[in-house]
Amino acid sequence: MRLIFGALIISLTYMYYYEVHGTELRCKCLDGKKLPPKTIMLGNFWFHRESGGPRCNNNEYFLYLGGGKKHGPGVCLSPHHPFSKWLDKRNDNRWYNVNVTRQPERGPGKITVTLVGLKE
């Protein structure tokens, strides 16, 4: 009987700790720490969108520096950022390796996003 009661207490303690300290059910991007919509970075990046979960109602958008196999540090994007809108057009949660370049012949501030590779 003590063994069953002890196992029950341990499992309840674990579930409480998991609920309080688990981060996968929370939003990864805090509202104040997002790349503003007017900030455009040029270069080779990984873009990724994660659908909202049970505790995060909105989609979250990420830009990872370094276009190689290893991702560099990640940056959260605003939902109104042009890169976030580019990801919304694809409507999936795949990783996109893209090259962002400036296109002065199209006008001031115009950019082109060229798809380099995909990863599930």
UniProtKB/Swiss-Prot annotation:
GO terms for cellular component: extracellular region. InterPro entries: Interleukin_8-like_sf (IPR036048). Keywords: Host-virus interaction, Inhibition of host chemokines by virus, Viral immunoevasion. The keyword NADP does not apply. One of its GO terms (biological process) is immune response. GO terms for molecular function: chemokine activity. Transmembrane segments: none annotated. Acts as a functional chemokine, inducing calcium mobilization, chemotaxis, and degranulation of neutrophils. Contributes to the induction of neutrophil chemotaxis by interacting with host CXCR1 and CXCR2 receptors. Interacts with host CXCR1 and CXCR2. Belongs to the intercrine alpha (chemokine CxC) family. This is Chemokine vCXCL1. It comes from Human cytomegalovirus (strain Merlin). The lineage of its organism: Viruses, Duplodnaviria, Heunggongvirae, Peploviricota, Herviviricetes. The gene is UL146.
